[in-house]
Amino acid sequence: MSIMPTLDMDKDTFTQVGYLYNLLDKIGHLGLFERDLSCYMLEVLAVDSQNMREINFAHRAKNSTTDVLSFPLDVSEGADSHILAKQMKICLGSVVINYELAQKVAKQRGHSTQDEISLLFIHGFLHILGYDHEVDNGEQRALEQKIIESLGLKESLIVRNTT
């Protein structure tokens, strides 16, 4: 899978989120997903808190900022979809990360901004793939935990927000 960065911030931010390419590659090589992720691409947007508030209001009618939002695109799983994906690199959707809030939370929790963005990215990516911790029976929580442990990260976003 490839990442199509659409960064709404300065050049330094682009450099700092470049590691997401490697993170996504590592996630793909864990062998946790049925579909071949190399056939798809994913848009990642890094925005500030004000822009995230506006996006959250426009799409969820919540007039507050948040850390990560996901916008999956409807990708057919028909017989020809995999062939088409290999030829065209179909976009699965967009993950929007509040870079400003990620920096703040990382400082509060005593870990790097890169680790915080990694947690947000993993969480958003699983939503793109159709997982939903608000309605599933723990599938997203379990998979998120497996991924972060495999990558040596500290805590699941879902677990952190329920404690």
From Swiss-Prot:
Its cofactor is Zn(2+). Gene3D superfamilies: Metalloproteases ('zincins'), catalytic domain. The keyword Metal-binding applies. It comes from the Bacteria. Binds 1 zinc ion. Its EC number is 3.1.-.-. It is found in: Cytoplasm. GO terms for molecular function: metalloendopeptidase activity; RNA endonuclease activity; zinc ion binding. Keywords: Cytoplasm, Endonuclease, Hydrolase, Metal-binding, Nuclease, Ribosome biogenesis, rRNA processing, Zinc. GO terms for cellular component: cytoplasm. The keyword Metal-binding applies. Zn(2+) binds at H123, H127, H133. One of its GO terms (biological process) is rRNA processing. PROSITE patterns: UPF0054. Its main location: cytoplasm. Single strand-specific metallo-endoribonuclease involved in late-stage 70S ribosome quality control and in maturation of the 3' terminus of the 16S rRNA. Belongs to the endoribonuclease YbeY family. PANTHER family: ENDORIBONUCLEASE YBEY, CHLOROPLASTIC. NCBIfam families: rRNA maturation RNase YbeY. This is Endoribonuclease YbeY. It comes from Helicobacter hepaticus (strain ATCC 51449 / 3B1).
